[in-house]
């Protein structure tokens, strides 16, 4: 009679356990999944719409899953999609009526929430969670909001004792823009700039002042740019001031504004008193 080896008795139980585990993981392919978000920050423009996309790492369906987008903490809900429909009960007041779900590719594990009419206050971190039964995974997204400000306006006045004063104003920027004054030779001109933030919109307005010397009054350029946007996208905003003070009491402001590839020209007259 052949003797049974002690280890042989455990082989059937090991085989059964292995088959059971295989059945658990291969039933619908979703028992162990990973959610991915964009690898880089997303850029959104104030007043426009922006999607926050997330997807499963494997090409498997997210149908039947609960999909949730929130801000810094789970209770700060941006949008929830559950049981095939949008759920608004938990949504933050700030996002009421401003979000929509894009599930056109949910069958292949992709979904997105669109934020409509982006504001400065949408800037920051987001999280998306895909949940099925007790399994869930989440990804983090970063949204950078940029505000394109208005074309700069230049006003020139004669301050009597301090000579000519040029003011460059603009509003609607985010974050704080960069302001640069140049003379006609392309040399920088020292300026005093002030920024203010609107409590209601979070957008930045600016007032930049120069008191040009005689060598600079032939012309000035005030340039304003957004640090988040390339020149070719935001446009280069400039206003050129030409002042004639050689014994005359009047002059012309020639204003040229270049924005998004277009040139706008206007002129107006002003009076200065020349000693």
From Swiss-Prot:
The chain crosses the membrane at residues 195-211. Keywords: Disulfide bond, Glycoprotein, Immunoglobulin domain, Membrane, Signal, Transmembrane, Transmembrane helix. Residues 212-275 are cytoplasmic. Residues 1-29 form the signal peptide. Glycans are attached at residues 59, 117, 123. It is found in: Membrane. GO terms for cellular component: membrane. Residues 30-194 are extracellular. It is a single-pass type I membrane protein. Residues 30-140 form the Ig-like V-type domain. SUPFAM superfamilies: Immunoglobulin. Disulfide bonds join 54-128. Belongs to the immunoglobulin superfamily. BTN/MOG family. This is Butyrophilin-like protein 10. It comes from Mus musculus (Mouse). The lineage of its organism: Eukaryota, Metazoa, Chordata, Craniata, Vertebrata. The gene is Btnl10.
